[in-house]
UniProtKB/Swiss-Prot annotation:
Keywords annotated in UniProt: Methylation, Ribonucleoprotein, Ribosomal protein, RNA-binding, rRNA-binding
Post-translational modification: One or more lysine residues are methylated.
Gene Ontology terms describing biological process: translation
Phylogenetic classification of the source organism: Bacteria, Thermotogati, Thermotogota, Thermotogae, Petrotogales
Cellular-component GO terms for this entry: cytosolic large ribosomal subunit
InterPro entries listed in its UniProt record: Ribosomal_uL11 (IPR000911), Ribosomal_uL11_bac-typ (IPR006519), Ribosomal_uL11_C (IPR020783), Ribosomal_uL11_C_sf (IPR036769), Ribosomal_uL11_CS (IPR020785), Ribosomal_uL11_N (IPR020784), Ribosomal_uL11_N_sf (IPR036796)
Protein name: Large ribosomal subunit protein uL11
Domain of life per record: Bacteria
SMART domains associated with the record: RL11
Source organism: Petrotoga mobilis (strain DSM 10674 / SJ95)
PROSITE patterns: RIBOSOMAL_L11 (PS00359)
A GO molecular-function annotation: structural constituent of ribosome
């Protein structure tokens, strides 16, 4: 018989650096999940992407077991990384804090394609370009 799903918990964690401290502890501890087991499995699965912020979807079952799916990094994280910035603009419509090339935009769209609601690469590029604009980052040709 299949396990009964208790809850799906969504977190954003730095790859290879999950610890039982917040945010992992409070989010999973209330469902009785073995925190060290989750941290070891997550860190092992994401060790090759160290330093990257990754969304993770953790399915917790009634018997306190779990499975998790690691998604691609958020578009805003990838855009900031491509532009070499720590954060976006305070007033995006008024100030430009950085620029990225169309080639970088295409690479980000290819990376995010599986998680985006887009049928083709051009649509994905438009979504990522909108994210960049909302952060005060211009797209160069």
């Amino acid at each position: 018989m299949a396990k009964k799903l208790l809850r799906v918990v969504k977190l954003q964690l730095e790859a290879g650096k999950a610890t039982p401290a917040p945010p992992v502890g409070p989010a999973l501890g209330q469902y009785g999940v073995n925190l060290m087991e989750f941290c070891k499995k997550f860190n092992a699965a994401t060790a090759d992407q160290a330093g990257t912020l990754l969304p993770v979807e953790i399915s917790v079952f009634e018997d306190r077991s779990f499975t998790f799916i690691v998604k691609t990094p958020p578009a805003s994280f990838l855009v900031k990384k491509a532009a070499g910035l720590k954060s976006g603009a305070k007033e995006p419509s008024k100030e430009v804090v950085g620029k990225i090339k169309r080639k970088q935009l295409r690479e980000i769209a290819e990376t995010k394609m599986q998680d985006l609601n887009a049928k083709d690469l051009d649509a994905a590029m438009k979504i990522i370009a909108g994210t960049a604009r909302s952060m005060g980052i211009e797209i160069e040709d």
